[in-house]
UniProtKB/Swiss-Prot annotation:
The active site is at 138 (proton donor/acceptor). InterPro entries: dCTP_deaminase, dUTPase-like_sf, dUTPase_trimeric. The keyword Transport does not apply. Catalyzes the deamination of dCTP to dUTP. Pathway: Pyrimidine metabolism; dUMP biosynthesis; dUMP from dCTP (dUTP route): step 1/2. One of its GO terms (molecular function) is nucleotide binding. This is dCTP deaminase. It catalyses: dCTP + H2O + H(+) = dUTP + NH4(+). One of its GO terms (biological process) is dUMP biosynthetic process.
Length: 191
């Protein structure tokens, strides 16, 4: 597998709809000229933005977190340009971008250093071959202080790995009828 460059990412987004909406360059300021956490195409990746939809963990119901029997009441829904994650807590969000991953590509997501240096960690499982949807983002605030996430700004970087022509997967995410195929919005655990 080889990592793909900005040229390849632009081509796949424009010609094959791999990322929508798509920013071909790197945006570092908003429309009023204020600095923001960057998003868009980088040398060997794509920095995604967070939408304004958030789900913040709460303990008001004192339930046990169980991925097989997940209680939707464990979250508070927030729509805002900013999400405040409580100390040592967790929030879900989604990307603005919708992805359509080719059969011969695997995408790995890494957090942005701007957030990591503040103790905010983003986790996303790999985007598998032929998966499509909005990416659900998992944010952990590892600090003893409240932490802020900004909507409509960069939050994570996607790295695109392309298989050699003789090594394309036999079974894709679509072939397996993956449970998160076509997800839109912030998607909670499914079994």
């Amino acid at each position: 597998m080889s990592i793909k460059s900005d040229r390849w990412i632009r081509h796949m987004a424009k010609q094959h709809g791999m990322i929508a909406p798509f920013e071909p360059g790197q945006i570092k300021q908003n429309t009023t000229g204020q600095r923001i956490v960057s998003y868009g195409t980088s040398s060997y990746g794509y920095d995604v933005r967070c939408s304004h939809e958030f789900k913040i963990f709460t303990n008001i119901n004192s339930t046990i977190v169980d991925p097989k029997q997940f209680d939707n009441g464990s979250f508070i829904d927030v729509e805002s340009d900013v999400c405040i994650i409580p100390p040592n807590s967790f929030a879900l969000a989604r990307t603005i971008e919708y992805f359509r991953i080719p059969r011969n590509v695997l995408v790995i997501c890494l957090g942005k250093s701007t957030y990591a240096r503040c103790g905010i960690i983003v986790n996303v499982t790999p985007l598998e071959p032929e998966w499509e949807g909005h990416v659900t983002l998992e944010f952990s605030n590892t600090t003893p202080l409240p932490a802020r996430i900004y909507a409509n700004e960069g939050v994570a970087q996607m790295l695109f790995l392309q298989a050699d022509p003789d090594d394309v997967c036999e079974t894709s995410y679509r072939d397996r009828n993956g449970k998160y195929q076509g997800q839109t919005g912030v998607t909670l655990p499914r079994t």
